[in-house]
Amino acid sequence: MAIHLYKTSTSSTRNGAVQVKSNPRNNLISGQRRCGKGRNARGIITARHRGGGHKRLYRKIDFRRNEKDIYGKIVTIEYDPNRNAYICLIHYGDGEKRYILHPRGAIIGDTIVSGTEVPIKMGNALPLTDMPLGTAIHNIEITLGRGGQLARAAGAVAKLIAKEGKSATLKLPSGEVRLISKNCSATVGQVGNVGVNQKRLGRAGSKRWLGKRPVVRGVVMNPVDHPHGGGEGRAPIGRKSPTTPWGYPALGRRSRKRNKYSDNFIIRRRSK
């Protein structure tokens, strides 16, 4: 996959880049119907700032990495419209072809493998019990056999900091420190496309292609629309602390459900 840099001909293409991407494999894609785009069955907005967007094909990603002890080769590195990380197509020795998340630094032609006693190499997947302390990992399982569920976004990386008994201690990208079964698998390395949060879209239309609608500040609304609204001119919000459009405290209040079963596995809550 090549990266094409735009010339500075217009303000919307300044500092812009686009991926010259290949067509995905037909047996690894499926159509998807984006239900509602933020609306419920009656057409009422239930999730704000969503709607529109370009039509997408879903790429089937192998989060389980259950092709054990079979070496695979990275054939392509492709753009995926359903996530901010790149994906890469793997051709395994037994003829199987699958998509996985692109590890940072992996190039076309590299070989990867998953199993119990495989080298600690970028892109390889193995159980946490076989990894040394301090290993950088991503695509981490929470439940054995369910597939990776943690650290899957672009640039995400977790760290294995301890192993004791049947559990391993991980430091997640959010700063949370929690316990996971040592038998769960993870992939060595960091997810690629690290600088995605520094990408300049250049114009509002590029944001609309992603299915994101404009965000309006509550302080410029009317009182009927938002608790911050109303007043003459540039008036303050008129409250001790900011609130959501429905009057609940915002910016700092804990929103996690109390007494969840997973509280027993969290050693230190995430940092703000």
UniProtKB/Swiss-Prot annotation:
Any one GO cellular component localisation term in the record: mitochondrial large ribosomal subunit
Keyword Zinc: no
GO molecular function, one term: rRNA binding
Gene3D superfamilies on file: 2.30.30.30, Nucleic acid-binding proteins, Ribosomal protein L2, domain 3
Keywords noted in UniProt: Chloroplast, Methylation, Plastid, Ribonucleoprotein, Ribosomal protein
Modified residues (N-methylalanine): A2
Record-annotated disulphide pairs: none
Top-rank lineage group of the source organism: Eukaryota
GO aspect biological process, one term: mitochondrial translation
Stretch list, region Disordered: 1-33, 220-272
UniProt biased composition (Polar residues): 7-30
Compartments where located: Plastid, Chloroplast
InterPro entries: NA-bd_OB-fold, Rib_uL2_dom2, Ribosomal_uL2, Ribosomal_uL2_bac/org-type, Ribosomal_uL2_C, Ribosomal_uL2_CS, Ribosomal_uL2_dom3, Ribosomal_uL2_RNA-bd_dom
UniProt similarity note: Belongs to the universal ribosomal protein uL2 family.
Oligomeric and partner information: Component of the chloroplast large ribosomal subunit (LSU). Mature 70S chloroplast ribosomes of higher plants consist of a small (30S) and a large (50S) subunit. The 30S small subunit contains 1 molecule of ribosomal RNA (16S rRNA) and 24 different proteins. The 50S large subunit contains 3 rRNA molecules (23S, 5S and 4.5S rRNA) and 33 different proteins.
Role played: Component of the chloroplast ribosome (chloro-ribosome), a dedicated translation machinery responsible for the synthesis of chloroplast genome-encoded proteins, including proteins of the transcription and translation machinery and components of the photosynthetic apparatus.
Protein's UniProt name: Large ribosomal subunit protein uL2cz/uL2cy
Species this protein is from: Spinacia oleracea (Spinach)
